[in-house]
């Protein structure tokens, strides 16, 4: 088992022990949405409680994760913050939009190294990736469109409701959906 998977299990066990609903996103969730997963060196974890509860949620993380008072303030303000655990980036996301409530209800449980873990469903992951809009996100979205085109279609509809059909992220996701091979 790799260091990253050990840390993932540590985060999962800590949050589950604190009865905090959560799911892993990023490349971990992506691995269950595409035909050819890509590597990663960080963990993305969505903790499904209001960002105003950041102090409680961040205190529940494993002891090795460095959390300063300024990190709590950042999560309360922005709904997200990159933390570190022995040099491994742990990107924490908390609820600060109505979308997060819907996402929490769509979490799927998958097998990883003989254990069950919660991950974002592919359509929700696609919405977040379109909103982030980094180059690697668009490559990931193209891969999702090939493997599970229905999830890209769902993401297109969700994104239209969130940002409108004149938003560049929406327009680009429509293009990804339209250009997938048959």
Language-model-detected regions and their locations in the chain:
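Compositionally biased terminal segments of proteins
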Residues: 1-182
